[in-house]
Amino acid sequence: MKTQMNYAKEGVFTKEMQIVAQKENLSKDFLLENIACGKIIIPANINHKSLDPNGIGFGLRTKVNVNLGVSNDCVDYSEEMKKVELAHKFGIEAIMDLSNYGKTSRFRDELVNVSKAMIGTVPVYDAVGFLEKDLKQIGAKDFLDVVYHHAKSGVDFMTIHAGINSRATHIFKQSKRLTNIVSRGGSVLYAWMMMKDAENPFFEYYDDLLDICLKYDVTLSLGDALRPGSTHDASDGAQISELIELSLLTQRAWDVGVQVMIEGPGHMAINEIEANMQLEKRLCKGAPFYVLGPLVTDIGAGYDHISGAIGGAVAAASGADMLCYVTPAEHLRLPNLEDVREGIVATKIAAHAGDIAKLPKERARDDEMSKARQEIDWEKMFKLAIDGEKAKKMFNERRPDDLNSCSMCGKMCAMNTMNQILKGEDVSLV
């Protein structure tokens, strides 16, 4: 089976590439060149028939991913499907099913069947439930069986923590972290490695993993098991050593035509973000960077969507290609529907803010909003807003008598005042 990368290397412009080129207003040659060299990916499993393809990477708009899925404390698949509907409503490009309890295949199959967004999973989360074995009883190649099952089901990308190998764990053990390993998948693999006194199975059998990805054109999202879970731990030796391992794994994947993106931090002080984005691009030769946040402070519990949006905007402006949303429930509980909505909107704002910096053409929508505000065209403002539904609701909650203003300024509306005076009209404030 040929992947999007293989086709690009041969100069074949696939239907998925055509769709992405039209969405992003890019030329055929630009897209082919950058997919061929790995700077742009189009995650598109051959079995995901409902997919509306999107590209991730150099010269493209920053994409947003929404996480959902059940845990052993919250098993309500119907609510998770409502989150999927909400993600579709806001035009989210990627959805990850992070279910880590029970038999997850039925939900995942339904997700692939109905979702036009690209679907991602973390197979190691599903290992215990799928294999019906406790962690210590799982064999190295058993993990590949889970990967194969996910690939065959139609998921477009998978987080695989292949970089936390024996070399990286050696560096980690010497680190003086406050929060050790905060990646769920990374912690599970590290525990397995320590209990079995064995190498990371995804690293040891990486070539077998690539064969699975090739068969279904699954994009590898190389997970950062050693991402910083606190600003104290950011940019330390453990994080960077794993990134170096991921750069080597990226090249091995490219050599056979498997598409790759790199996952990144995490928690990180705002002044470290730009350098980390540049470091990933340098080490991984321009591979797309997919970051969680980053959260720029550790004390925003209940408001971590704000911390994440601040970091995400800086990251996107500095080269990050996809942002994983953060909700107000981060670090506290499984998010509910309102949490998901708040997280989506905050992250879409961050992504767009970053795009204004790196893709000047993306300012056009903002300019249209500014014109609508000057013209006091409320309906146009609601249409252009990222969350126009909420904007309209808030406006109507204290609807002004004079629609040439809002209830904040009333007759002292600056826009209306200037519109009148520049037309040569008198301005009355009584």
From Swiss-Prot:
Binding site for [4Fe-4S] cluster: C406, C409, C413
Required co-factors: [4Fe-4S] cluster
Keyword terms, alphabetized: 4Fe-4S, Iron, Iron-sulfur, Lyase, Metal-binding, S-adenosyl-L-methionine, Thiamine biosynthesis, Zinc
Record keyword Iron present: yes
A GO cellular component entry from the record: cytosol
EC number per UniProt: 4.1.99.17
UniProt remark on cofactor binding: Binds 1 [4Fe-4S] cluster per subunit. The cluster is coordinated with 3 cysteines and an exchangeable S-adenosyl-L-methionine.
Domain of life according to the entry: Bacteria
The protein's enzyme class: lyase
GO MF annotations in UniProt: 4 iron, 4 sulfur cluster binding; carbon-carbon lyase activity; zinc ion binding
Alphabetized HAMAP family for the sequence: ThiC
Function as written in the Swiss-Prot or TrEMBL entry: Catalyzes the synthesis of the hydroxymethylpyrimidine phosphate (HMP-P) moiety of thiamine from aminoimidazole ribotide (AIR) in a radical S-adenosyl-L-methionine (SAM)-dependent reaction.
Family from the record: Belongs to the ThiC family.
Quaternary context: Homodimer.
Identification of the protein by name: Phosphomethylpyrimidine synthase
